[in-house]
């Protein structure tokens, strides 16, 4: 289900002043490492491929990075932890379009939406990632549409398959 989305930073561009440093681990778009077959059936590597195990990655393909301080988002990205459904009349195990902000960013902080807050988000804007054996949804700050007050029955949801591998 998941393509390897973790990379180690070997070099950073001089043109950008980034908090990402050499040696940091980054979570990138799945197409950076994608291998596909063209119309003639020939195996091709992504346009990000350089040589050996080295790939170029544009800043908009980097969603999260880990340094000595922990995980940090890039730009307007944020990560949401799904919560368990408390509905007895559904087979869905998680609540739709509601979750707990795991990793935020400065624009959300300015709106007083901080990690640990219960938030609602728009449909079809989230991408599923496995970060340290936790299933999280990556989305843009603009996809967060409401901050909820806790009712007390919210519980994080992490499917059992996320713990393997």
Predicted regions and their residues:
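Acidic-enriched and Gly/Ser
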Residues: 1-165
């Amino acid at each position: 289900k998941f393509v390897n989305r973790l990379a180690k930073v070997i070099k950073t561009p001089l043109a950008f002043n980034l908090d990402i440093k050499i040696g940091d681990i980054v979570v990138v778009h799945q197409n950076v490492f994608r291998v596909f077959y063209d119309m003639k059936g020939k195996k091709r590597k992504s346009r990000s491929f350089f040589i050996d195990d080295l790939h170029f990655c544009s800043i908009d393909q980097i969603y999260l990075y880990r340094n000595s301080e922990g995980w940090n988002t890039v730009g307007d990205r944020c990560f949401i932890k799904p919560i368990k459904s408390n509905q007895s009349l559904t087979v869905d195990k998680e609540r739709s379009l509601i979750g707990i902000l795991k990793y935020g960013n400065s624009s959300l902080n300015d709106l007083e939406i901080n990690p640990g807050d219960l938030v609602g988000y728009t449909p079809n804007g989230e991408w599923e990632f496995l970060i340290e054996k936790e299933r999280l949804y990556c989305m843009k700050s603009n996809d967060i549409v409401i901050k909820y007050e806790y009712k007390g029955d919210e519980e994080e949801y992490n499917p059992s398959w996320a713990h393997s591998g």
